[in-house]
Amino acid sequence: MNLHEYQAKQLFAEYGLPVPEGFACDTAQEAFEAAGRISTDKKVVKCQVHAGGRGKAGGVEIHDTKDGVKEFAQKWLGKNLVTFQTDAKGQPVTKILVEEASNIANELYLGAVVDRATRRIVFMASTEGGVDIEKIAEETPELIHQAAIDPLVGPQPYQGRELAFKLGLVGDQIKQFVKIFLGLGNMFAQYDLALLEINPLVVTAEGNLLCLDGKINIDSNAMYRQPKLREMHDPSQEDEREAHAAQWELNYVALDGSIGCMVNGAGLAMGTMDIVNLHGGQPANFLDVGGGATKERVTEAFKIILSDTNVKAVLVNIFGGIVRCDLIADGIIGAVEEVGVKVPVVVRLEGNNAPLGSKKLAESGLNIIAATSLTEAAEKVVAAAEGK
C-alpha cells in the first residue's frame, strides 16, 4: 500500500523530522485559505497522486498569490493527472498539498528498502538528489552509499554520521542528518514499511536539512497490525478491478493483453502467462484465485476478468490440490451462466477431482473448450483470441 506525500510528511513530523509547513486540501477554497496561513511569499502546490513525474506533467507549481493557488486547485481537483508512471487514464486528484516554498542550496537522496539477500533494512544515501535513483544506480553506482541496519539493535548514530560525512555534510548538519536517519530507521521497523524515500532531502540556503518530498510503501501483508496506516488507504488511486479483487481475496493485476487468465497459485499463474506469451498471446491479467477458491470467488474472478473490454478469450488453468476441480467447474458454469460470457473459454483441469470437473463442464452444454495439457490450453486460447 502506498501513501500520499502529505501522509508521508505527517509521519515524518511525528518522528521529529523537519518538513515544510503545509496543508492538504480537498477544495479550492481550502487551498486558498491554506495559502493565507503560509508565511512564505511563494507557495508550492502539488497534486496528490500515487505516481512520480508530477512536476513534468504540470501537477506541481509555485505561486505568489492565494488566487494562483486557488486556480491551480480548481484546475486539478476532480481531474486525472497523467505522468510517465501512470497509464493513459492517469490518477484522480482528490487532494492538493499547499506548502511553503524553500530556498534550496543542495539536493540529496535518502531512502531505505528491505534487502532480502542480507535480511536487513538497508539505507541508501546519495549526493545526487532530485533525480531517479535507479538511473544513478545504473550509471554511477559509486555515488550511492549504504548502511545496513542490524534488526537486534536498530539504527545506530555512528551509521548516520558515516553517511553524513560521505554526503559532505558539516557542522550542525551532521547532527540533523543523524536525527533524520534514526527517526526513519525506527519508523521503517515500527510501521512495517517496504520502501521509504526522501527525494530530495535538501540543504536550505540557511544550511538546514529539510524533507522536501516523501514516498512510503507499506508491506501489505502487515496491514492487519497497522490500523493507523489502514485508515490512510486511498482506494481512488487503485485500479478498480484490483480493488474489487482484493475484497474477494483474489490476487489480481491488470495487464495490457487480450487473454484473461484465471489460475490457482502464483507460480502456476506466472508459468501460465509465460506459456501464453510463448505461443504468441498476450495476457490481460495475472489472477490467482488461491487455494481456498469457492464457487462465489470463481464467479467474481470471471466478472473481474471480463470487465476488461480488451479480453478476447479466457484461459482457466487449475491444478487441484487444496482446491477441488469439481468446485472450480461449478464456479465456471455458474459464472458463464450468470455473467453471460461472450468470449471463448478454454479450461484445463488437473489433479483433485479433475475427471469429475471435466465431466461437469462437458455436460453443462456451454461453449467451453477443454484442454488436457498446458501447452494445448495455451495453443487453443491464443487461437480463440485471434478468432481462429
UniProtKB/Swiss-Prot annotation:
Keywords: ATP-binding, Ligase, Magnesium, Metal-binding, Nucleotide-binding, Tricarboxylic acid cycle. One of its GO terms (cellular component) is cytosol. ATP binds at K46, G53, R54, G55, E99, S102, E107. Its cofactor is Mg(2+). SUPFAM superfamilies: Glutathione synthetase ATP-binding domain-like, Succinyl-CoA synthetase domains. GO terms for biological process: succinyl-CoA metabolic process; tricarboxylic acid cycle. InterPro entries: ATP-grasp (IPR011761), ATP-grasp_succ-CoA_synth-type (IPR013650), ATP_grasp_subdomain_1 (IPR013815), Succ-CoA_synthase_bsu_CS (IPR017866), SUCC_ACL_C (IPR005811), Succ_CoA_ligase-like_bsu (IPR005809), Succinyl-CoA_synth-like (IPR016102). Pathway: Carbohydrate metabolism; tricarboxylic acid cycle; succinate from succinyl-CoA (ligase route): step 1/1. Substrate binds at N264, G321, I322, V323. PROSITE patterns: ATP_GRASP, SUCCINYL_COA_LIG_3. It holds the Pfam family ATP-grasp_2. Belongs to the succinate/malate CoA ligase beta subunit family. Succinyl-CoA synthetase functions in the citric acid cycle (TCA), coupling the hydrolysis of succinyl-CoA to the synthesis of either ATP or GTP and thus represents the only step of substrate-level phosphorylation in the TCA. The beta subunit provides nucleotide specificity of the enzyme and binds the substrate succinate, while the binding sites for coenzyme A and phosphate are found in the alpha subunit. This is Succinate--CoA ligase [ADP-forming] subunit beta. It comes from Photobacterium profundum (strain SS9). The gene is sucC.
